Amino acid sequence: MLSRRHLLEHPCIAWSLILGLASCGDENLQDAHSLDAKSTPMTFTVSHPGKKLTPKNTRATETDFEKNDKIGLFVAKADSPLEIGGNLVNNAALTYDGGKWTPAHTLYWDEGTYNAYAYYPYINKLSSIEDQPFNVSTDQSTHKSGTSLGGYEASDLLFATTKGIAASTAPVPLNFKHIMSKLTIRLIKGEDFEGEMPTTAAVYVHNTVPSATIDLQAGVATRYMKGYRQSIIAHQDDNYIYSAIIVPQRIENRMPLIEVVMKGVSYLFESKFQFKPGTEHLVNLIISDNPDQVKIEIGGEIQNWQ
């Protein structure tokens, strides 16, 4: 390496180095400005909120995306509201092939700054950006079959947004989050329960409204005000563990909430409850030999559950 003394003694060398650095900087600026936005294809990296989980045994559809899953994508001007049409990208379906997400046709950038909005599962025909109807399944015990999602996965609406983006060869990150609420129920054998407790049961969540309206720009689910309260069949995660996706809402009056049916016996728990958006609510249900003496323990909340 040339010392400062040597550089001073050889001003030609120093001047050459300065010119070289300036030349490199000019080339980088030239590359950035020479990017043709309209000829630059969009690419994306997609992250499922459950991707960081390391469970011992969990179905892939609950913790990550699977091959042939589809997300809906909008790309709109950063200084304009998202519209049902007229954006740079309008509800394009991106399909996962097991390694990357690709649209049916190549999507290209344009000049300017944009915001990207994405949701899952994909809805083929949207009717609104601010009030898109959406329903969670009332039978979330069903499993994926062919191209049809299971009841639980079809109910777990995910949303992602990335703002202030422009034409680039770098992929746009889409980090999804849950916008519904989740109730996880763990069945625990009480001290006075005789014999072995069955590893499977029918578990219901009563008196919630399964219909919602979705704001696809804000990523917010709101209970449909004219919706009717219904019962939801929970999904079995493991022995004694069940869960259900619930539209965010408040049950203000005490009423039947959780019912467990095992060996022909019904265990019913009544309560008020607030289902918060993006929150997993954990409850332990203590099963007694006497169905009238069922007890519950609130196990806490997990924000932005994985």
PLM regions with names:
Residues 2-12, 21-306:
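Sec-type signal peptide cleavage vicinity
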